[in-house]
Amino acid sequence: MSSGRIVQIIGAVIDVEFPRDSVPAVYDALKVESKGLTLEVQQQLGDGIVRCIAMGSSEGLSRNLEVTGTGAPVSVPVGNETLGRIMDVLGNPIDECGPIGEQERMPIHRKAPAYDELSSTTDLLETGVKVIDLVCPFAKGGKVGLFGGAGVGKTVNMMELINNIALEHSGLSVFAGVGERTREGNDFYHEMQESGVVNVENFKESKVAMVYGQMNEPPGNRLRVALTGLTMAEKFRDEGRDVLLFIDNIYRYTLAGTEVSALLGRMPSAVGYQPTLAEEMGVLQERITSTKTGSITSVQAVYVPADDLTDPSPATTFAHLDSTVVLSRDIAAKGIYPAIDPLDSTSRQLDPLVIGAEHYDVARGVQSVLQRYKELKDIIAILGMDELSEEDKQTVNRARKIERFLSQPFHVAEVFTGAPGKYVPLKDTIAGFKGLLAGDFDHLPEQAFYMVGTIDEAVEKAAKIAGKAA
């Protein structure tokens, strides 16, 4: 075990001098025993000096403090003992429920699986959310991104997906909270307890492991917490299980990288991001993959700064995903939730050979009606509905019904809306939209389609509205 001394401290970045014959490797963990702080080596500057980022607050550090090399990267607990527990970036428990008691620890830095170990699948993962299952279906073992600006519902959508998939799919989940609100992490933990996914009495019966590096943490924690969660998911995958990995929020991972990059003295690139943005994103995303042993299905929330999808951070993330769910402020402004844009959201699974001709035709039919309505909006704004042809009037009426039918009450939003949540099976979703496109429900009022589950509920709601009017 080599030991060195701190020679410089700039915020979260700390330079440590070691004897020249025992300089630690890049990504090695170093310990400041007197402060209980872990550092991670980022650069070797020469002359025995290494530049590190602190995995915690650097307050109270001073020059000449002794630092010990561990000779290995940061390692975290893995395996069944992590289930039901909340851990920080170093794998320490933060839920006040005693030690983890792990049998095994693994380093957070690993190589991605080799090309010949990868497996691809075209099995669909039903989410019970109509708009997702219809226009941007998820693949089992695929990667999904939830893109949206501030306050359009990324976290609520993710919570609903956790509720629907993690409860319906009896497998294991790992939740990594990267630079998000502590309050949301707390709410999530209590919701998981209420739904039985976390069993505090008997952790062995829990189905989710949680790793948090929240907004108030130093950039080193936020930068590495995604890797900590991923390492736990990889262990479950390598045991031959199907794992769900939820990351909220990938943008904060990029942002932590930007903060660290500037402190490490790198020249910034476009919009002030780190020059290694694509590489850092690739290192994380290439490890989130399914192998012939087991699968990782990941759902990642991606904050879009100033609603600009061309910003380098979301733009870099797009390349790695199988399905992109884009949340729109315009749709949220209409009161339609989930505020998912059916024209902007895409999926590689939307192919007749994968999902079948009927599903494909209905999805494309819905998109073409909504696209035509979008084109007609300018004409309607200037000349009004009366100037449209009969065919266009019919398209507009159907599009407005489809728009409303894409809304749905969520289980996790029940406390706010008072409306019980709905899980809609895929076959019911396809049947409902097929009927709308065929004109079977042209006689029903628009409001009957708002915030209902299946088409039968819309018909019931229309009857109630008609009864009240009478």
Curated annotation (Swiss-Prot):
Pfam families in UniProt: ATP-synt_ab, ATP-synt_ab_N, ATP-synt_VA_C
Transmembrane segments annotated in the record for this chain: none
This enzyme's EC code(s): 7.1.2.2
Enzyme class of the recorded protein, top EC level: translocase
Swiss-Prot/TrEMBL catalytic activity: ATP + H2O + 4 H(+)(in) = ADP + phosphate + 5 H(+)(out)
GO cellular component: plasma membrane; proton-transporting ATP synthase complex
Bilayer topology annotation: Peripheral membrane protein
Binding site for ATP: 148-155
Example GO molecular function: proton-transporting ATP synthase activity, rotational mechanism
InterPro entries per record: AAA+_ATPase, ATP-synt_VA_C, ATP_synth_F1_bsu, ATPase_a/bsu_AS, ATPase_alpha/beta_chains, ATPase_F1/V1/A1_a/bsu_N, ATPase_F1/V1/A1_a/bsu_N_sf, ATPase_F1/V1/A1_a/bsu_nucl-bd
SUPFAM superfamilies named among the record's database cross-references: C-terminal domain of alpha and beta subunits of F1 ATP synthase (SSF47917), N-terminal domain of alpha and beta subunits of F1 ATP synthase (SSF50615), P-loop containing nucleoside triphosphate hydrolases (SSF52540)
Subcellular localization, as worded in the UniProt entry: Cell inner membrane
Record keywords: ATP synthesis, ATP-binding, Cell inner membrane, Cell membrane, CF(1), Hydrogen ion transport, Ion transport, Membrane, Nucleotide-binding, Translocase, Transport
Top-level taxon in the UniProt lineage: Bacteria
Subunit record text: F-type ATPases have 2 components, CF(1) - the catalytic core - and CF(0) - the membrane proton channel. CF(1) has five subunits: alpha(3), beta(3), gamma(1), delta(1), epsilon(1). CF(0) has three main subunits: a(1), b(2) and c(9-12). The alpha and beta chains form an alternating ring which encloses part of the gamma chain. CF(1) is attached to CF(0) by a central stalk formed by the gamma and epsilon chains, while a peripheral stalk is formed by the delta and b chains.
Function recorded in the entry: Produces ATP from ADP in the presence of a proton gradient across the membrane. The catalytic sites are hosted primarily by the beta subunits.
Protein name, entry field: ATP synthase subunit beta
Natural source organism: Teredinibacter turnerae (strain ATCC 39867 / T7901)
Originating gene: atpD
